[in-house]
């Protein structure tokens, strides 16, 4: 039975028993930034189990995409070396949200395995929690499992909890006996042994308690069920093989590697490991990229990069010199495309992302391996077997080697890595970054904000409707402490009951403006929003005395209009980018201010000039269409259902604000916007550049700022035309003629300099001396550039045939010294050794290779002395 058939049978079995078939959630957990990747079937139902969400079904089943390659569940180093470890896998599961419980869950599992799949009952064993007599009795009395085939284990193995507190309960697992031939051979071998004989294939979690902070277990009013069965494992059972990699889920991909490499699987254990690593990792890579992850140096993107680079390294071990992981995507899609059609829709994009990362890593892989091999050799000579943290950090920081990749490489040499030392180096780097950033006490003030918020201090934002408000001062802060009053010159923070000022959040800068009372005037230079319902105005009292409790007039500065233009334009920009580049474009960050907008987005390559122009045309077409901009609040689920764009990893509340621009853009957003797209006026992109692997940044202008930019470009064009004496707008043609002429003149200069060098060398060769059988020329040269000094030395070496050339020159009051040695003499005399002995004489330092070395110094009048020393130093 194939993996596809098992998946289909499982879902049909439970659908026939009243379960809703729920599609797999994306690997990036929606609305749960605490979870790196979906790693279990229950992830998407977490709020259902917690009682925070109600759906229109109380029992469900799914086949969930899962990745375990970071944090608590990190199987990466074992992948390819064992029969069971994977980065990507599918978890089949059935779930009950306060509906059925132990009796039904056990009955469903046993029926599916023994009747639907037809497994031999005599090769099945079950486990229960040590105190769960109820489950043990159900297994024995209801399903007829003999008592001797029911094992009891403690909390470590058979009790599940969502966290230190909250829902929890006992587990009951089902094991398959692979037979004594794959066991450890011990007479005591039984369920619970670490060998491969008894393999867990199904786990039933019975959530029946709530654990309090003091550890007390209280029965839940509506207990639930969470189950999981790995598709890869049950496939080994149904296909009669001992390794997950021998199932059809992997064999098609491994066969593709065989075809591409010309090597056979099962002919070499070393090659087999590499093929298994590549097969597993390309599955994880394909699904992660499809779900919106791109390789980077942090978070989810870094996990993906680690997986991809480990696969690329094993591809190199198999003999691949060109990118190959990208060529394996079609094999993954051939196996998985039916169940996950999004893979087929995005196949070309996935291949491009993988190829770009493979090419990027290839640029540094060989150099990094050379450094690592050198370190291993040195450590072996010293009798050490641990790669130091400093070496790990250099490989990571300079050559892009994740630490687990380094560990994987040196494992065969019997080496381990100093992870603590690496973390210490990383922390030093973080500390240096912190030192370079000079804060202004925000962290201390933030504690004040937390205290105020816990006291119930709140602000009501009225700025969507108005730019002014009249409200009392509820809190006055100075120096991070609450005060009763503040006078002229004081830097203060003011909290009012209501405010039209937008607090910095969602990428939009905070408003500026004024706060006035009958006796005081405050210039607001910054507005913060430490909590969604708390807005803090930061500024300076420029006149009078302001007191807590004073009624005040709040007025937002006109810059808000420009910020609103830029914010709405940012929404249109994201929509246009998705139209031009593809649906893989996701927001990675943004900054919206009154002067410009900045938008960071996921994309694997620099945009072409044509793509940039197309994006500008789309945005400006929307502006000219003058579509209305509407904003309304709705439930998060409703917003997702109507297709509103959300920011990946952002934690949203139950109610969200959706901003819609005609039929072009619809996003979750709490920022301020124009009333109609035409209010933006004009949109112009200033720049597009990469800021990280797989992340691009666009900076743009709108309104009068965009117009002034175009006017400035026009002024510069006219100025250039005047300088180059271009007429009739033929700037480009005129410039091309000037550049061609410049190149011709440069070639003439180089020809003349070559002739001059030949003449100089003829004169200088008269000063050649023979020292111990070696021809030596040491002299000052009439050149004013170290580059020309090198060219002259090359000419002299050629003319000498064999010998040592030492030349000196002065440029801008500094001494320059060069030593060149012909290749036949480097075994006897080295240029680098000579320059190190000569450079102190001219008040400097230098170095180089055996054939060529240079030095610079601050004592040009000592050049003659240094050159006179050369003959003494030639052995």
From Swiss-Prot:
CDD domains (UniProt xref): AlaRS_core (cd00673)
Highest classification ranks of the organism: Bacteria, Pseudomonadati, Thermodesulfobacteriota, Desulfuromonadia, Geobacterales
Domain-related comment: Consists of three domains; the N-terminal catalytic domain, the editing domain and the C-terminal C-Ala domain. The editing domain removes incorrectly charged amino acids, while the C-Ala domain, along with tRNA(Ala), serves as a bridge to cooperatively bring together the editing and aminoacylation centers thus stimulating deacylation of misacylated tRNAs.
Record text on cofactor binding: Binds 1 zinc ion per subunit.
This enzyme's EC code(s): 6.1.1.7
Stored PANTHER family: ALANINE--TRNA LIGASE, CYTOPLASMIC, ALANYL-TRNA SYNTHETASE
Protein name: Alanine--tRNA ligase
Top-level EC class: ligase
GO molecular function term, any single one: tRNA binding
Main location: cytoplasm
HAMAP family in UniProt: Ala_tRNA_synth_B
Necessary cofactors: Zn(2+)
Function: Catalyzes the attachment of alanine to tRNA(Ala) in a two-step reaction: alanine is first activated by ATP to form Ala-AMP and then transferred to the acceptor end of tRNA(Ala). Also edits incorrectly charged Ser-tRNA(Ala) and Gly-tRNA(Ala) via its editing domain.
Keywords: Aminoacyl-tRNA synthetase, ATP-binding, Cytoplasm, Ligase, Metal-binding, Nucleotide-binding, Protein biosynthesis, RNA-binding, tRNA-binding, Zinc
Catalytic activity, reaction form: tRNA(Ala) + L-alanine + ATP = L-alanyl-tRNA(Ala) + AMP + diphosphate
Similarity comment: Belongs to the class-II aminoacyl-tRNA synthetase family.
